[in-house]
Amino acid sequence: MERNLRKKRLGRVVSDKMDKTIVVAVETKVRHPLYGKTVNRTTKFKAHDENNEARFGDRVFIMETRPLSKDKRWRLVEIVEKAK
C-alpha cells in the first residue's frame, strides 16, 4: 500500500501514560439519519509515539500503519499544537 493513500486523522492526546504509546481521541460530526441533528462522535485510537514526545492535551496528526501490537494500528506523524 502506498503511504499517501493511508488514512490520516487529527485528534487530541487523552493519555500518554504508556511507553511509546499515546491514546488519541478523534472527534467526527455525523448527521443523525432520522432527525438530522449533527452529533459529535468520539473514537479513541492507540498510536505509536517512538520518542515519547506527545503530551496530554496536544493536537496531533496520526497515520494508519501496519499492526504494531494487539490494539495499535496508527503512528504519530506530527504535533500540530502543544497543550498549554
UniProtKB/Swiss-Prot annotation:
Keywords, ordered alphabetically: Ribonucleoprotein, Ribosomal protein, RNA-binding, rRNA-binding
One Pfam match: Ribosomal_S17
CC terms in the record's Gene Ontology section: cytosolic small ribosomal subunit
UniProt-listed GO biological process terms: translation
SUPFAM superfamilies: Nucleic acid-binding proteins
Coiled coil: none
Quaternary structure (record): Part of the 30S ribosomal subunit.
Family: Belongs to the universal ribosomal protein uS17 family.
NCBIfam families membership: PRK05610.1, uS17_bact
HAMAP family registered for this protein in UniProt: Ribosomal_uS17_B (MF_01345_B)
General function of this protein: One of the primary rRNA binding proteins, it binds specifically to the 5'-end of 16S ribosomal RNA.
The protein's name in its UniProt record: Small ribosomal subunit protein uS17
The species this protein was found in: Clostridium perfringens (strain SM101 / Type A)
Name of encoding gene: rpsQ
